[in-house]
Amino acid sequence: MVWRMPAETAPHERIWMAFPVEGVTLGDTAALREEGYAAWTAVATAVAARTPVAILVDPTEVARARRMLPGEVEIVEAPVDEYWMRDHGPTFVVDDETGRLGAVDWIFNGWGAPEWAQWQKSAGHARLIADAVGAEIVPSLLVNEGGGIHVDGEGTVLLTETVQLDPRRNRYADRARVEAAVSYTHLTLPTNREV
């Protein structure tokens, strides 16, 4: 099976988000925190006008999410500590021969395990979402964030050295190991093209 990550501009069925959690990088004042919640709500609302949205919401935030989000946004209750879904969520891939959907489960450690970050709950979101949509889980040995990779859907992948080669993320990584890990998760098609 060969997986291909479609370009970000390719049609897709749904946008996955995570709702903010009180006390996690939303601001030092009540006013700033409310602005943060309002911004997340505005994004979810704008996207939902064109594309279905599902949003993971921590049990402690369900009442607020139901009050703030429009009814067309699907609320999925799940433990959340980090809410930058692009970084800790799955990377969806497709097997073009069978049409099967896969979800790469990168290892997420809160951007290199800084003292301030809380990510243990959200590190499991890739598998939770894969299960919810019936995608095959594509495991990875690479500590990565989804925002650290970009593809064109035709075999080109751009990586961010400050992510993949960061010793706080991938202690023993060098270019060859990162390229092998990316080839293992089959982000390029065919996998023998230069990365």
Which residues make up each language-model segment?
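Conserved small/polar residues in nucleotide/adenosyl-binding loops
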Residues: 185-191
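Internal alpha/beta scaffold segment
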Residues: 176-183
